[in-house]
Amino acid sequence: MEERTPILSVKDLVVNYGAIQALKGASLDVYAGEIVAVIGANGAGKSTMMNAIMGDVPRASGEILLDGKLLPHKSYQVVSAGISLSPEGRKVFAPLTVLENLDMGAFPLSDRSQIEKQKEEVFQLFPRLLERKNQYAGTLSGGEQQMLAIGRALMAKPRVLLLDEPSLGLAPII
């Protein structure tokens, strides 16, 4: 039987915020095609783990591997390697339009036609964003900002998509 290599592997990850240990020995393997949910109480370290994977918070120890290779420590390098994060809390670029926010997420892509194709895919997932494409992100509702944050993360065509509190502010379609 052939052994599969995880697309993403987190091994014994430790993250400290000053004297406070936010993560102690967290480990996780994610294989291609899997949907994985990390569940825990508030303050358990779920967001910290995602931010450490992205290189947004320093790790005290442990390894993070993508396809068996050590992941860089800088977030722009992590995105270029194939991982995107839609962070908790609707972090959008408020003074930019919806289209400009989506362009910011597409920085790893160099082909303009590929960028436009990605925008079309985002607009298929979130038709409301197409209606608001020239509107400033800061004037969108909370749910629309959440859609934009997820759409922006998808623009890089990630192989691994991390979603932190993805349903925050989203209303069910009635």
Where are these regions (language model features)?
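Glycine-rich phosphate-binding loops of nucleotide-dependent enzymes
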Residues: 2-174
